[in-house]
Amino acid sequence: WGIDLSSYGQRQLHRRLRFMMERAGDSDLDAFLEHLARNRELSVRLKDQFTINVSEFFRDAHLFARLETMLRPRGQCHGARKIWSAGCSYGAEPYSLAIMLKEHSPHDSWQVIATDIDRQILARARQGVFTERELRNVSPTRRRRFFTNIDDEQYAISPQLERKVKFSELDLLKPRSRPPGGCD
């Protein structure tokens, strides 16, 4: 797969591997490896166990603040923009970018392309539903403008932003992987 596992501790790797072996119904490593060789879906699920999905809205606030200063003042952004969010996880980062672009580009001549290796996490990202905790860095003004409260704990991204963010699967470490073209 080309995934760098050096940041994992050995116990953590063993725990995740044992979890997948149990789910697959295999009691020993040799049986599990044979099962992996025959079952592509199991192989994908194992890979997903070893990819970490960490994200939150406006995470690394200083970077978003810098990006915001780089965006032209409201009303001056006339050209089409295409922004790529690589390793987008469950969608908080690309939607954070979309919020900023919407605020600074009133003509909607922009799109965010969001990619990740994990199919399951992309499915969640496409749903556009986030918890109160995941929105902790989103101001009340932005919450009112860009989210709909579903219940006490969940919020849905607004349709105006949802249609501006396109999610797709991409493994950045595969030699033939190509980033989306035309991105700023």
Q: How would you name each of these model-derived features?
A:
Residues 78-96, 110-113:
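Conserved class I S-adenosyl-L-methionine
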Residues 108-184:
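Extended basic-aromatic, gly/pro-enriched interface segments that bind polyanionic ligands
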Residues 10, 61, 94-95, 179-180:
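Conserved strand-to-helix beginnings and helix N-cap segments that scaffold or border functional pockets
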Residues 1-84:
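Conserved AdoMet
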Residues 69, 99-103, 127:
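Short, well-ordered alpha-helices that flank and scaffold nucleotide-derived cofactor binding pockets
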